[in-house]
């Protein structure tokens, strides 16, 4: 079928991995859609295609047995053409499931009622880069305008972000570990059918040491604690959904952003 193209400019990528879902929404082919997200697979397509996508907190949408080991890194989430539709789908998706001990109960008030309430946050943090990543100037400008909209509505907006300095190392290790656990058998039996990026990620996971995994889990715990403390002060954190605008559809992944080159797709 070829690559999934951006509905606003077919020379550009729709992003992935839920690019097809985002395009279906943007073109009116679908009313609601589902996406999965470990490292942006739901958020990047939503951003590239001009629709709404939400990566929920872990446990908000329950995993099933089919999720295998991927229970505390990747999540399932809703995609829609507007916030109210997305909230409606999240209400339908959320809730406890006996197959997932980390799943959370349904909240007393629905997400749809919250979306329709018209209430606004009191204090919002804004960060163009979360202190950890380059961001294309065009993306940074769009994010800055969004922050200004909050300020114009009377919300206190301050430039701040939680301390996420270990995020890249932690995510690289835990993602590779997940790939090794869930896909090593595929590498052994069907290597010729796997794309180079997946092969690389599995092999990175197979090379990990116990010490690296221990360090990554400790980093995750520390970042979670610092982020929870951060939200004692702020109601929301505004940040770019993706670091670049839609790139040419021929490109396999983002190779450079704001002068920084990347040697892998993660």
Show the residue positions of the predicted features:
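Short, well-ordered beta-to-alpha junction loops that form the rim of enzyme active sites
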Residues: 129, 162, 234, 240-243
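Acyltransferase
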Residues: 110, 114, 135-160, 183-189, ...
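Short, surface-exposed loop/helix-turn segments at secondary-structure junctions
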Residues: 4, 102-106, 215, 247-266
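Short helix-loop capping/hinge segments that flank enzyme active sites or metal/cofactor-binding pockets
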Residues: 113-127, 174-228, 240-245, 249-252
